[in-house]
Regions:
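Hydrophobic/aromatic beta-strand elements that line small-molecule binding cavities or substrate pockets
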Residues: 66, 543, 567-568
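Short acidic-hydrophobic surface loop/beta-edge motif
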Residues: 5, 82, 202, 318, ...
């Protein structure tokens, strides 16, 4: 009635059902309960169990304890206990109609690590790149025909106190709990298999993830999720060591719907970039460094939507140094760029600020940082189309306000169709392009119009444009101009003077020259007091800069003190040469009155002296020379005035020639005409 077998070995082969097994170290006890029921107890070493040419068990110690029922066309095991190594389950097995079977199994409080250890070898690739631990309970059914390759599988499970990590990445989830189902689908294979996750809850070190998901096609995992998250960005610093974002801090929360392939190896990034992703997010009190930026970027708050590779920023408040910026718009292909899937990303939208401090964007504690890092190469990884609206911009002494217009960046080039701004007490409109050439130099080409700029403020702000010939303290007035400019800098942002070209139309209104030494050199003709402060209403000219020379075509200055025509050039090495024509009707009258006190009282009001004195003013920043080119005098004097001509000649001789001893008398050509 009872049977006991010790230390036996059993080898079984059935080519029809394609079942093969080899059992060693068998200790078997069979107790008969009735004619068709037995109690089977056994423990053994299963060397192998193969089914349909697949290795299900290899070298595992197995303990079995349960009832066996043997009936015609039906064999069953009801609520038996089986333990494979440290994995314990209850199961029931029913064979019927000779070829069909149903296997029900159930486990409670089992270690997931034991399931992994006892997973058939042909399935272990599932776990190659992941680490899973924790508790699981399950109940399932395997149903099929013995002679068919794959039976159907359906499992209900729940997980608690579990963890999940990646072998090649520090990404880690802990305290995982969820429940769901596992099924191999209609075709009973990996391709139609699915795993559902319901009420999924997990924690990171400083965050949480909750939601649900489904994994389908275990040959090539497809993941669909609907999750809510609240995460610390500190943890992301370790996920991608090659990311241009580093030293991240702050929090991000939102929801995410993911649909696409997923893998836990090197193909993870590719799958991520090609998935359908939709996420609404909020960022608060976040900071990070980005590439070679000089300072940390602070995001006070931001709200947006991620739609696959497009990030729509609904609103954001960003702080960089002392500058607070508001941005809304789209960022496309940022994630593919971060993960080296695409060479660049594109930003478009609206940027506004109450005040921008330019120095914060180009300097840090290292004085050479700007030259050594930021200027050697303009970035080629970003493209931008931005509408700007900046209330104030500060850079050194430069104060700009009400900046608006479009700013574009592509292929290492900034460009704009139109930007408006206010500066130096006036308004400016500009268009142009600033770019990095193939020679690694930097070039600008701009068409600029400005109206009513304050001359003193302009010269003061730009530190007299690096020259000392004429300075802010010498100038007052309003200047308007339209000019075209081409300029180049080397890769440390030093101007290349020989490549500077400028063509302009300018007009100065309400102009004043104050204590301008070169003009005071004309004191032989005009009172020194008059020359110290010259006022004129309007001055117009076309200025050209080319070949390191500023060319000044003839322009007329009219004032109460002096009227003159000036033309010439001023080189970048501070050498200059100007032609000056003086209209001496008033000049000589002033001198004449000093010598002849009765002239003013006796002269007729219609009498005029018209004399043209042509001078050359040349020199450099260290010296100034003035010489005569030609002196012409015209007269139209009524009868009796010729006598006064001799007095005028005497004045010139005494007051001009004697003071300019280096001038040769023969160079003064006096041309007199009897008629006007």
């Amino acid at each position: 009635e009872n049977l006991s077998i010790q230390n036996s070995e059993i080898i079984y082969t059935n080519d029809i059902s394609n079942i093969h097994f080899h059992l060693k170290e068998n200790n078997i006890s069979i107790e008969k309960k009735d004619a068709q029921k037995y109690l089977l107890k056994c423990n053994f070493l299963c060397q192998r169990l193969n089914y349909n040419n697949k290795k299900l068990i290899e070298k595992k110690h197995i303990n079995f304890n349960g009832p066996v029922s043997l009936k015609e066309n039906n064999t069953s095991i009801i609520n038996a206990h089986i333990k494979i190594d440290q994995l314990s389950s209850l199961f029931s097995l029913n064979f019927f109609d000779k070829n069909n079977f149903i296997l029900d199994f159930k486990g409670e409080g089992q270690e997931i690590s034991q399931i992994i250890l006892n997973t058939p070898s042909y399935l272990k690739d599932i776990y190659n790149s992941i680490l899973i631990n924790g508790k699981i309970q399950y109940s399932g059914e395997i149903k099929g025909e013995v002679e068919k390759e794959n039976p159907s599988l359906n499992i209900d499970y729940s997980i608690s106190s579990s963890s999940f990590g990646l072998k090649d990445n520090p990404f880690y989830l802990k305290e995982i709990s969820c429940f769901g189902t596992i099924s191999n689908g209609l075709a009973n294979n990996f391709e139609t298999s699915s795993i559902t996750l319901e009420d999924f809850i997990a924690k990171t070190n400083e965050g949480t993830v909750e939601g649900k998901g489904t994994i389908t096609n275990l040959n090539s995992y497809n993941l669909t999720t609907d999750l809510n998250y609240n995460l610390s960005l500190i943890e992301t610093n370790f996920y991608n060591q090659d990311s241009p974002f580093y030293k991240m801090a702050g929090r991000i929360n939102g929801d995410i719907q993911y649909k696409g392939k997923v893998s836990f190896n090197k193909g993870f990034i590719y799958d991520l970039m090609n998935a359908e992703i939709y996420s609404r997010f909020n960022i608060n009190e976040t900071s990070f460094l980005y590439k070679d930026f000089a300072q940390k970027i602070f995001i006070k708050n931001a709200e947006g939507i991620i739609d696959s590779n497009k990030i729509n920023i609904l609103n954001s408040l960003i702080k960089y140094g002392r500058s607070n910026l508001e941005f809304s718009g789209d960022i496309i292909d940022l994630f593919p760029n971060i993960f080296n899937q695409k060479p660049s990303f594109h930003v478009s939208g609206d940027l506004s600020s109450k005040e921008v401090f330019v120095e914060d964007f180009i300097t840090n504690n290292d004085q050479n940082y700007f030259k050594e890092k930021l200027i050697k190469n303009m970035p080629d990884y970003i493209e931008a189309d931005i509408n700007i609206n900046l209330a104030k911009i500060n850079y050194s002494k430069i104060k700009i306000s009400k900046v608006s217009g479009d700013l574009n960046y592509k292929n290492r080039a900034f460009s704009t169709d139109t930007i408006f701004l206010n500066a130096f007490g006036g308004s400016v409109k500009l268009s142009g392009k600033f770019y990095q050439s193939f020679e690694n130099n930097f070039k600008i080409s701009t068409n600029t119009k400005f109206d009513n700029l304050d001359i003193f403020n302009t010269f003061y702000t730009f530190e007299n444009f690096g020259q000392s010939f004429i300075q802010a303290k010498h100038l007052k007035g309003k200047i308007s101009s339209q000019f075209v400019c081409n300029a180049s800098w080397n890769n440390t942002f030093e101007l290349i003077p020989e490549k500077l070209q400028l063509s302009s139309n300018l007009q100065v209104n309400e102009g004043e020259l104050i204590n301008f030494k070169p003009l005071e050199s004309l004191s032989s003709f005009v009172s020194i007091d008059d020359l110290k402060h010259i006022k004129f209403s309007t001055l117009k000219n076309n200025i050209e800069i080319k070949d390191m020379r500023i060319k000044v075509p003839t322009m007329e200055i009219k004032s109460s003190a002096i009227s003159l025509l000036i033309s010439g050039y001023h080189d970048f090495n501070q050498e200059f040469k100007y032609k000056i024509s003086l209209l001496l009707s008033e000049l000589l009258a002033n001198k004449f009155r000093l010598k002849n006190k009765d002239y003013s009282a006796n002269a007729d009001s219609t009498e005029k002296l018209i004399t043209n004195v042509q001078l050359t003013m040349s020199g450099d920043k260290n010296k100034l020379d003035i010489s005569f080119d030609k002196l012409k005098m015209k007269e139209h004097i009524q009868q009796g005035v010729k006598k006064e001509i001799q007095n005028i000649k005497q004045i010139i001789k005494e007051d001009i020639i004697q003071k300019k001893e280096n001038l040769i008398e023969e160079e003064l050509e006096l041309e007199w005409e009897d008629d006007f």
